[in-house]
Amino acid sequence: MELAAVILAAGKGTRMKSNLPKVLHQLCGRPMLSHVLNSVVAAGVDKTVVVAGFGAEQVTDFVGEKARVVLQREQLGTAHALLQAEGELTDYPGHLLVVCGDTPLLRAETLAKLADYHCESGAVATLLTAEMADPTGYGRVIRTTEGNVSHIVEQKDASPEELNVHEINTGVYCFKVPGLFNALKEISPANVQGEYYLTDIIQIFVQRGLTVKAVTLEDAREVQGINDRIQLSRAEVVLRHRVLEELMVQGVTIMDPENTYVDQGVKVGNDTVILPFTFLQGKTEIGSQCVLGPGSKINNCIIGDRNEIQYSVLVESKIGNDATIGPYAYLRPGTVLADHVKVGDFVEIKKSTIGHGSKIPHLSYVGDATIGEKVNVGAGTITCNYDGKKKYQTTLEDGAFIGSNTNLVAPVKVGQGAVIAAGSTITKDVPDNALGVARGRQTNLADWPKKQRKNS
């Protein structure tokens, strides 16, 4: 079966009140257009055309090589939008899915089912319909006694009998491509809006004696359109629960799905536990038997097995196995932790590599550093990596011990097994197994407080 798709994505989305094209607003970490593109490709489509209008440059930049983009310069209706794809499909011999770019909940399985039924039935067109308890505001699908589609009637034009119909048009179609665009050119804008409606093509086909079929959708939420921020948030909830349920089926424990946020495409290993108010974003990959959260945000990170991360933020970092992070740690881009590393409370790490078994338990900043194995970094240690113009490297070799409240002024190296005395400001390299001390000598003045009071 040769199957192409046209995604109608030209609308401005006025009710979104945004400078961003509606189809580029995000759900579960991806623009809604991305979800639609993924669904049509997974349904077996071999060629995709996106019809852009408002914000066409942004839409084109996002689509890239994933599809061809054509421009609808004036928004004159859905039939007019589809007609803009004619140049890309003139000689296409197969079938065409038509979907809206603001239906990110539409499943690939639904589109595949529609296309398969359409091809097997021999119909010139097949609609995707849905049964709604309250169809108010929707166009009703009227069928013949044989079960074929007779026409679609808008609510304002429907008779009392037609108003009792609960089957509605979802705006998703499958057509035979040969002859489609000639039929589209017969549609006239004879309506209040002065637009070319794609629904009018059904009556054109029926009047020619051609068969139009319909497939009824099992879950009407799949075609829930998005026209404002309220509908966007509702769609986000539906999609988020799909993502979480898929993870749970795969063996992930999610303590509170209502308060857990995982982007589509995030990978999580089995027996990992995700606690409330945890955000897993971007291309994050989590191993098995981890405990994440509560209250953690992990963005574009690769995390191994058996790690514990609580109340912390990790961005573009790589974590080995058996690490403990937090509470209140901040791992910035370029951070790499080996196995069995401890990063404790109020620790910030940036563009640094921490070796096997090393510990940074609390109240420290580590930036542009390479730390070896089994290094202990005491509380209040600061790598002074920036002189106002350039960043410099700090190196702590295997087994080094850094006392509390130490300043390491880069570029500087502390050798293997070396010890830095607490309170030191280290500006020169410390050799292997040496003690580095760089602080003022303590002086005790006897009876000083008493003398101060006497002189005051």
Swiss-Prot record:
Primary site of residence: cytoplasm
Superkingdom as given in the UniProt entry: Bacteria
Binding, acetyl-CoA: A379, N385, Y386, S404, A422, R439
Cysteines paired by S-S bonds: none
Subcellular location, record wording: Cytoplasm
Cofactor note: Binds 1 Mg(2+) ion per subunit.
Residues the entry annotates as binding UDP-N-acetyl-alpha-D-glucosamine: 8-11, 22, 72, 77-78, 139, 154, 169, 227, 332, 350, 365, 376
Cross-referenced HAMAP family: GlmU
Region annotation (Linker) ranges: 230-250
Summary of the function given for this chain in its UniProt record: Catalyzes the last two sequential reactions in the de novo biosynthetic pathway for UDP-N-acetylglucosamine (UDP-GlcNAc). The C-terminal domain catalyzes the transfer of acetyl group from acetyl coenzyme A to glucosamine-1-phosphate (GlcN-1-P) to produce N-acetylglucosamine-1-phosphate (GlcNAc-1-P), which is converted into UDP-GlcNAc by the transfer of uridine 5-monophosphate (from uridine 5-triphosphate), a reaction catalyzed by the N-terminal domain.
Assembly, per entry: Homotrimer.
Gene: glmU
Gene Ontology CC, one term: membrane
Protein name as it appears in the record: Bifunctional protein GlmU
Region N-acetyltransferase, annotated ranges: 251-456
EC primary class: transferase
Keywords, comma-separated and alphabetical: Acyltransferase, Cell shape, Cell wall biogenesis/degradation, Cytoplasm, Magnesium, Metal-binding, Multifunctional enzyme, Nucleotidyltransferase, Peptidoglycan synthesis, Repeat, Transferase
One Pfam family here: NTP_transf_3
Organism the protein comes from: Desulforamulus reducens (strain ATCC BAA-1160 / DSM 100696 / MI-1)
Record carries keyword Acyltransferase: yes
Required co-factors: Mg(2+)
